[in-house]
């Protein structure tokens, strides 16, 4: 059964998609967000929820979680005209009478216009690649950190040597009972200053070691077995929680099936963010044009233009003059 028609469907529930949905609500149209993950917020919420962001206008600094919470709160003003679909991956969309048919892995949706704000595509964590790892995931094995306080008083082991691994280790030093970092190389890939802080901290550093096995009972991991690189030495580390910080891999395989014009892994757009298909627009990291600057702030600026152009496309005979928000909201 085909879904009811929405004015604008936004593919992607990251910061840019959320702000585009808010602005569409401000303009009085109905909006649907289709997000492939189980939560809104995109990369700031998933990849660096506790890290500080410094380039959002009017905020000297805020975390990825705070940014996401603010955007969701802002959007909630128009919850009566906004529908959110989580854990749905857009496979294809086709032009039909009056708009577009959008097919996901779960359903068929209908929209009069589409705004693509899916960033660099769907992403997933790089895992340890060990047997039984999936059994412990999201119980006491984590690929990203949402709340530091959940590790209070625990023995925490962190695998990884990049910025996130080092930042989490330093942040947990005064919260956890103990913090141990396992890295396959002697040298870390994180910022030099952070590495110096790590080396002078109370964090235990085990290098160069690689994970070999996980031991546990039920859904809880209890020990991580590691082996020294190019040696036979094996250690068993007792733990309460394990954080795997090997980064995330992105995939835009479905994007290539959308029959648009592309520049490398992004969608080519006009100065008004129109793609090669009329009625379909792209913003944020998903959009490519000359002089593009891949910042969240840039995407925030692109969103109103794309929304206004989508409204002009849907309702060409309507008076679509842009009015400031101070005149629209009491």
UniProtKB/Swiss-Prot annotation:
Binding of FAD, residues: 35, 43, 48, 90, 123, 285, 326
Comment on bound cofactor: Binds 1 FAD per subunit.
InterPro entries membership: FAD/NAD-bd_sf (IPR036188), FAD/NAD-binding_dom (IPR023753), Fd--NADP_Rdtase_type_2 (IPR022890), Ferredoxin-NADP_redctase_2 (IPR050097)
Record field: catalytic activity: 2 reduced [2Fe-2S]-[ferredoxin] + NADP(+) + H(+) = 2 oxidized [2Fe-2S]-[ferredoxin] + NADPH
GO MF, one annotated term: ferredoxin-NADP+ reductase activity
Gene3D superfamilies per UniProt: FAD/NAD(P)-binding domain (3.50.50.60)
Cofactor(s) this protein requires: FAD
Keyword list, A-Z: FAD, Flavoprotein, NADP, Oxidoreductase
Enzyme class, broadest EC rank: oxidoreductase
EC number: 1.18.1.2
Annotated signal peptide: none
Xref: HAMAP family: FENR2
Protein family membership: Belongs to the ferredoxin--NADP reductase type 2 family.
Self-association and partners: Homodimer.
Protein name: Ferredoxin--NADP reductase
Lineage: Bacteria, Bacillati, Bacillota, Bacilli, Lactobacillales
């Amino acid at each position: 059964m085909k879904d009811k028609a929405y004015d604008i469907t936004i593919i992607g529930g990251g910061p840019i998609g959320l702000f585009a949905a808010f602005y569409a609500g401000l303009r009085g149209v109905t909006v649907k967000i289709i997000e492939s993950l189980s939560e809104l917020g995109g990369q700031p919420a998933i990849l660096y929820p506790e890290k500080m962001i410094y380039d959002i206008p009017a905020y000297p600094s805020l975390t990825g979680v705070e940014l996401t919470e603010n955007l969701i709160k802002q959007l909630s003003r128009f919850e009566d005209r906004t529908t959110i679909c989580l854990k749905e991956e857009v496979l294809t969309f086709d032009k039909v009478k009056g708009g577009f048919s959008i097919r996901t892995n779960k359903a068929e949706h209908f929209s009069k216009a589409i705004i693509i704000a899916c960033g660099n595509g769907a992403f997933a964590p790089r895992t340890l690649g060990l047997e039984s790892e999936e059994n412990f995931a999201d119980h006491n094995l984590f690929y990203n950190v949402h709340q530091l306080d959940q590790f209070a008083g625990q023995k925490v082991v962190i695998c990884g040597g990049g910025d996130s691994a080092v930042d989490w280790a330093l942040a947990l030093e005064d919260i956890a009972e103990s913090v141990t970092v396992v890295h396959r190389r002697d040298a870390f890939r994180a910022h030099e200053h952070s590495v110096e802080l790590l080396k002078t901290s109370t964090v235990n550093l085990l290098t160069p070691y690689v994970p070999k096995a996980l031991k546990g009972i039920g859904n809880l991991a209890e020990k991580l077995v590691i082996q020294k690189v190019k040696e036979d030495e094996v250690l068993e580390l007792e733990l309460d929680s394990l954080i795997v910080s090997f980064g995330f891999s992105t995939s835009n395989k479905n994007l290539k099936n959308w029959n648009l014009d592309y520049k490398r892994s992004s969608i080519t757009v006009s100065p008004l963010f129109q793609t090669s298909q009329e009625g379909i627009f792209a913003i944020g990291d998903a959009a490519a044009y000359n002089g593009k600057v891949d910042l969240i702030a840039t995407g925030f600026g692109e969103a109103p233009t794309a929304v206004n152009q989508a409204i002009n496309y849907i309702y060409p005979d309507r008076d679509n003059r842009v009015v400031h928000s101070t005149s629209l909201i009491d």
